[in-house]
Amino acid sequence: MEEAGGPMARAKARVVSATLTWRQRPPTQEEIKHGFHKVSLVSGAQMEAPQKEMFEFSRREEVEVNGFATQEEETVNCQGPRDTAGSKNFQSHGPIFSKKYIPPPKEKRPEGRLKEAVDQSDGSRQAPRTEPPCVGAMARTELLVPLPGPREPSPHPGVGLTSGSSRSLEEYRVTRTVRTTTVVGGHVDRRMSSSVTVRPVSSGEALPRGRQVSRMVPPVVVGSPPGSPSRSQAVKVLSNLVPAGHSPPASHLPRPTAGGPRSTGLGSTVGAALRQLPETGTAELKDSSALASTGIPASAHLPKNQDAPAACPDRDQGRAPDARACELWQVLGAPSSTELPLQTSQGQASVPSSPRLETHVPSPGLTHPAKQPVVPTHPGARLTPLVLPPKKKDGPVDPPAATVLPMVRSEHVTVPGQPPAPSTTRRKDVPSPGGLSAPSSPRNKFVQNSENVPVLPFTQREVVKGPGAPAASSPTRKEVVQGSSASAASSPTWKEVVKGPGAPAASSPTQKEVVQGSSAPAALFPTWKEVVKGPGAPDASFPTWKEVVKGPGAPAASSPTQKEVVQGSGAPAALSTTPKEVVKGPGAPAASSPTQKEVVKGPCAPAASSPTQKEVVQGSGAPAALSPKSTEVVQGPKGSSSIQKEAVQGIAGSLAPPLTKEETVQGPIAPATSLPKQDKGVQDSEGSPISSLTQKEVVQDPDALPAPSSSVDRVSPSPGGTPAPVPTGAEASTESQLVSDPTEGKTCTETSREEDEVALAADLEIFLDTLRSMEPPEILRTHRLPRAPRSSYLSMYATLPAIEEDQLGPWVLGPGPQEVPSLEEKEEEEEEEPENPYLSDDEKLQRRQEKAGPSPSRDLHPARPTQVSCSPLEMMKKHVAGTKGPHSELGLELQGGSRPTSRLGGSLLFGSLVPTAKEASTPEPLGTKLSALLPHGAPGLRKVPGQLPLLCSERSSPTEKLACSLPLEGWSPALKTQGKLNTRPGKVIFFSESGCQGSGREVWGDIVDASGWAPVASIRVVRGCWVLYEEPEFRGQKLVLPEGDMELRTPGTKWSPQGIGSLRRVVWDYSTPEISLFSEEGLKGEQVKLTEALKNSQGLEKPLQVASATVSAGLWLLYPKPLFEDTPYILEPGEYPTSEAWGTSDPSVGSLKPMRLGCPSVEKPGEPRAVVYEAPGFQGRSWEVSRDIYNLQQPEDSQSPHLASVGSLRVLGGCWVGYEKEGFRGHQYLLEEGEYPDWSHWGGYDELLTSLRVIRTDFGDPAVVLFEAMDFEGHGVEVSKALPDVELVQHGPSTQAIHVLSGVWVAYQEVGFSGEQYVLEKGVYRNCEDWGAGNSTLASLQPVLQVGEHDLHFVSKIQLFSRPDFLGDHFSFEDDQAALPASFRPQSCRVHGGSWILFDETNFEGDQHILSEGEFPTLTAMGCLASTVLGSLQKVSLHFSEPSIFLYGLECFEGKEIELSREVRSLQAEGFNNHVLSVRIKGGIWVLCEHSDFRGRQWLVGSCEITNWLTYSGTQRVGSLYPIKQRRVYFRLWNAALGGFLAVPDHVEDMKAGRVVVADPQAGGSCIWYYEDGLLKNQMAPTMSLQVIGPPSPGSKVVLWAESRLPRQTWSISESGHICSQMFEGQILDVKGGRGYDRDHVVLWEPDEDRASQIWTIHVL
């Protein structure tokens, strides 16, 4: 034999190529031109009588890998029989490669092995070659050598006793010289060892296993010419490549048992050369008689490690394959006809598939062009492409015998008859009676098929092969499927280990999948594993996220949740996750996904029931392929493969055009049954069920019947194939249905069938019991976290476009996408849509009936247009071309993000239910206001601190709220036509002292001469815009008075005169201000017209020169400097022909602005009072009213005057609404406090004013939501400030529903607050008729504000009237009154601000009558008898604690206990006994009433303890009770010991937390606090509250934190001045003290009388 060595050049990955080829002729040019880097195994099937021949092999190899330089010289002399020339069909095996492997530390290596090991050459025990773990280690190698042992017979019927070849005459002569150079951290270590071994080979010995060397160069497979050495001889030579000094210790070597039947691997195997692949050793079978007894000749044993390398030295793993990408071909050897005649196919040609999706479709029997690597055609030849392996992926292969594979986490495997060895942490005991379970390396999967079905999963590529060439592929995992006598090859990523019959199960701790063939014992896999088991394999238990695929005779495996069980006699299934592609055929493995429970059973496997979300498919030949998401199912006659690059090969090896999305290819003899609703089961004649869920295409080989598919109706038949109809909308069910198998037992051997059935029956009962005891996965679904998306080497092209119909999010563990009806029902049950609270009971019932009834929009099977077919790579490229910015990563990458995704996103059925991008944002809080309502949801109830529950929904995004509701800069209502101008009354108050203090004078209109007034120090303009004149008759120097307060004596004021000459109101309506500026005098030259303020005229194209001007509307201020600086010139309406007319000779203008009216306002909302006059000008009869008047012309009582009309009126207090017609209908007019001399001043359309109504509500914190559709549907926007045009917030032009969240609003039909007025109070308005409009036009709106609302001063006041209905003489009190005037007998009263107690006697004695804020027109309304005479009154003190009261049935707080924290109208109605003898109040101030409904005698009780209620009140019962509700009170907390206020020194509005210290009032910061629902809040940060950070120990810091933090930390302020924590009992607020930097910080401390800093004084504003 001749030896050819490859070049020793170092690749980029520091790998030197080495070539070992087997041939008997000089290499051809085709072979030499490639840089071979492989170890080609050449084997032939023995078909005739053998002949003897001498063989000699010598080899010299020098390899340097990652710093290890190894030189080996070997000579092998073999003498033995050789098969007759011409009777061999040689098969070139794929290259055997491996990547650098770093062995685990010694203490973590697998234990529990047998004690003895026999060396392959000399029988001496060898230690594994390892390097100590250090930083400088360049590479590590460990040889894990399986022990020799007997082979088990194949259970397949095609394998029989075929003796005829013997190696008894062979002799091994091996001379090894190994030179090793190791570079570790700069240290060079050179070692050399030499050994010579001469020994005969017995017939029963197993062939040695080849040694693997780490390489990373493109391999090219060249077919061996005829006449090459026999396969067994090649195997012997390669097996001797293992150095003599590197066999592992005996403790690491497994000893196979002879109990369970194990089949040898039939056919050839291919392996993927990856990094971190262990160098496996060899094992020899010492006893050939064991094999002979099982029916397998000794010559039938194949090498245990035959790997085809798949390597590409491309560093950029993210790039897609290009022209330079290596093409990796893998040739699968077919078994000899004597071994398995059922799987031989004649005339198959190998057709390459390039990484660019170049698809060749040759006819049957077609061979390649000469330029491509050629593999000779012979029976059973199979061709499978290899794809680029990503970095850091492992792919060790598994031999038929047990192989010890290195692990990261050890798992203890127990063998029958051998005590388990002590195991370290994270180990699991796996009993394996049928064979020794060997741990596999992490993230590796081996698949061994029982029918010689190698399954090759590769990355993002698919080759579908004809008869006899099954291969399952998954785009993101490496799967290696081994047949009963064939090894498996693994693909670059996500390796899976699937083992065939006779192969022990491999236990993998994480991220592994194991598929076992017949007679293979099961392994235990903790998490994320998939197990495929063959016949005769005992069941395995899988905790979570597992998939079980079982062959014939394999008992069912139980898995608690998210399981898939696929059973079949022919071949186990290779399982892959999403996106999944499944290839199946008679005898081909099926792929299933881990998201649903699926049960696929073979002929010898009873049906296993799974609780929920299962799909059951039965078949005799192959298990079903079940893949809920992105599944591709390709079924060939004897197997097929699927990857996302698809090439479908026909019967004789022809290729079909590449398919896209999901495809289903069925081979001959593969009929498919239609899927029932919600359960899919497809069964072929060989028992090969197939299920394809969504967006699939069907490609069928000849004689294939239609296969079910859904969504995409496309058929791409291969040569001779018949198109299969693709039904749409096939649903999967939550209940499994078992499809019976008519051909059960066809592929099971007669000898093992009875034993398998017995074992299966027992295991099935255990499995069913386990399933019955499990909880349904719906319970666990909410506890699962989203699964992280897996990376792909195609990430540069983003991911595939999102599936348009019903794509589940990445965290959804529920049913598949076809389960539309079941999902609808579950969503309606679990996520029931909130009912619209605005609807009446009848409307709600009608809505429920509409939802329950059929609807055309609920059609689940609409017609779908066919989609253009293109490859996934092309779709991704198109997808990238049209994608920008952060949206380039779609699919799982996008779904795995922070934003929850919806499976309805691209749905044709439910796409309209998903809000658009701008509506999908999360609503932002608006302080105490409710957030805006989001679309497609009925408004719900939301609690607002200190307010009643308000109706709201989630409809608006932050961009649609107040942030964008403010008027845009440069907006002018003059651009649109205004309607009727609405006017406002005027009011100015002049004070004699600064700060608006002292005596005051109210002015309602123009004052021609005010020279006789007393000196004025400050002015408060309540309404309107006024001008002060220095002289009477509106002459002299002028001063503009806008709305607000102004000091006249301050240095900054430009008012020099000592007195006021005259006063005039210049702006009284909402007309648009307008001024025209001319460049020449006399109103000539270039004209510039303005309606808005101009901040800086220098920003114009040329300087603004103003020589004359005309003011058409409003009052304008012209400033000589930009930004409204310096003293302005005031221009009232009129013409100014020269600049001297407004007091200057300089024509330049720096800036100018108009004066506008503000929002409507009310000063005394709780004191409504108006005087109505019959004639204009306040003439004629008058009528003073303080209540609603239904009809002014027809009074309700006889005492009121009858007014024929209303000519004028004065509003003295409160906010009123006047109506044109009686009964509060017709045109509406807002009436503020002021004077209205005639109907034009209140903005009337005519003189009619028939009814009046008082607005009694809270004017603070206004907020309103506008909807474009009725019943609060459609687009909604929230507004909280005046809006001159609703289009500024992208709303309108139609408004058909309004929800006033708080405050009082005035809406206008036209822009600029003009046209018809509509007064809106807190509540909901379903349509425009509800607010009095005839159409839905609403163009502008503004709130009604309360004067002095933001002064934060708390005033509690009571008004007593001598007559009912607030008539007659009246007295107002703000303090306690021990005695009322003897001549004054109150008959009605009003309470403002707080609560008051009225006593029947003086000095606060007698019966109590507690009155909260409101109006009480009679004594009966006040809770008094008609004859009651009130003697004194007292104000209820403030409290700062949450209400809590305890009622006891016996004295001294004994007996039954009733705890309450809310009002109770009747204790008996609540089920309590109203007999009470003692009371304890822990918080709040309570009113206890003698009878129900707050009737009878009343007692006001604060925080106290009453040991005997009978003695205190004179009664033994409490009928009803309620806590006093207190309005918001602002206060300061004074610490007398430190001389400072509790303050927040920082601006915490935009901070997560704020410091809280004791500071001087002049130090800055905010020291104003308020108490709300138990929380202490600062006025500067209303969304934060006082909270303790850290453990509640003395000295823990107290800061301001978001009030949404849970649990809520509430506080109470006791009468003693302690601020107590309600959450941490016994802890109060204190100051740290000391001399540190944080000595002034507020902390938590235990009460201590010696610490005066714990006492706080409340200063109410």
Swiss-Prot record:
Region Disordered: start-end pairs: 72-135, 148-168, 242-268, 297-321, 337-380, 411-757, 808-871, 883-903
Acidic residues bias spans: 825-835
GO MF entries: carbohydrate binding
Record's compositionally biased regions (Basic and acidic residues): 105-118, 841-851
Domain (Beta/gamma crystallin 'Greek key'): residue spans on this chain: 986-1023, 1024-1067, 1073-1113, 1114-1156, 1168-1213, 1214-1256, 1262-1302, 1303-1345, 1356-1393, 1394-1437, 1443-1483, 1484-1525
Low complexity bias (residue ranges): 431-442, 706-719
InterPro entries: Beta/Gamma-Crystallin, Beta/gamma_crystallin, G_crystallin-like, Ricin_B-like_lectins, Ricin_B_lectin
CDD domains listed in its UniProt record: beta-trefoil_Ricin_CRYBG2
Keyword check for Phosphoprotein: no
Protein name: Beta/gamma crystallin domain-containing protein 2
